[in-house]
């Protein structure tokens, strides 16, 4: 296995170090190459993501990312120039966000309900393609547009992936959209789910408007198994899903090229938290959970399950104890 590591900014290097510690414990001998990308490189060289680095990243099996973002860099420079560029250059058309409430983790929902679903979010289309513009900026007559792009090809490959995941799980898929208002894009998503669903007669299909889905994610999250949705709606509901499962500090994600032509990238959802960087108190659990996703994607299912069980044991027994970053990594690695 050849792994590229982008530790990034803030707490990124700290949590990534613990994730790598767990990876080495469960799968020894991984070839690792670290890339200095983020605020430090930007300030030193003016570069965000050189073409040469993109070419090198393509030669790896996967990418492990820590966190990107620093208040010393103008807003959007790293987010668009690094994170979004990687997504489009490496065709990460699926953003995978598991949502599971682990034993021992407090949910803001009463009764700690059973929550275990996954959101399959389209990652390269929708309103995030940069298709739009503005005229008469700064005047009372300013007009700004953001065009949401949805292609039959792009929608179908994400829907097909979601059905495959539903078949391997509890055989239930929910399409989340807003078809009563976004009739053109929504119609494409609905037709595609119907067409692809014919190949999966064992998977039950449901539809919910995005506003209804947010309500049910709070009042009845157990109804969801696999959710498939577009880029914008997915961006919103995945953070809500993280909130009901204990917060983004316990949320992992995968940015996936399902064709495997390019390396997929795995990362914790949380930000770079520069206010606590260097103090050794950042929780690396989400970064370690990202390792489990990475291993599963690469077919190392037994190793992925071992990491997940070790994380579950850690969360179930940690109580209110505040552990140092390195202690969390050691504890989870020891439980493998």
Curated annotation (Swiss-Prot):
Give Gene Ontology CC terms: cytoplasm
Question: Mind listing the GO biological process terms from this record?
Answer: L-leucine biosynthetic process
What is the cofactor note? Binds 1 Mg(2+) or Mn(2+) ion per subunit.
Residue sites binding NAD(+) per the record: 271-283
The pathway that the record names for this protein is: Amino-acid biosynthesis; L-leucine biosynthesis; L-leucine from 3-methyl-2-oxobutanoate: step 3/4
Query: Which residues carry the site feature described as Important for catalysis?
Result: 128, 178
Residues that hold Mg(2+) according to the record: 211, 235, 239
Q: Required co-factor?
A: Mg(2+); Mn(2+)
Superkingdom field: Bacteria
GO MF term set: 3-isopropylmalate dehydrogenase activity; magnesium ion binding; NAD binding
Q: List ligand-binding residues for substrate.
A: 87, 97, 121, 211
Which keywords does this chain's UniProt record carry? Amino-acid biosynthesis, Branched-chain amino acid biosynthesis, Cytoplasm, Leucine biosynthesis, Magnesium, Manganese, Metal-binding, NAD, Oxidoreductase
One family name in Pfam for this protein: Iso_dh
EC category: oxidoreductase
> Which reaction equation describes what this protein catalyses?
(2R,3S)-3-isopropylmalate + NAD(+) = 4-methyl-2-oxopentanoate + CO2 + NADH
| Listed EC numbers | 1.1.1.85
Q: Where in the cell is it found?
A: Cytoplasm
The UniProt entry, under HAMAP family, shows: LeuB_type2
Of which family is this protein a member? Belongs to the isocitrate and isopropylmalate dehydrogenases family. LeuB type 2 subfamily.
Q: What does this protein do?
A: Catalyzes the oxidation of 3-carboxy-2-hydroxy-4-methylpentanoate (3-isopropylmalate) to 3-carboxy-4-methyl-2-oxopentanoate. The product decarboxylates to 4-methyl-2 oxopentanoate.
Q: Kindly state the subunit structure of this protein.
A: Homodimer.
| Name the UniProt record assigns to this protein | 3-isopropylmalate dehydrogenase
Q: What is the lineage of its organism?
A: Bacteria, Bacillati, Actinomycetota, Actinomycetes, Mycobacteriales
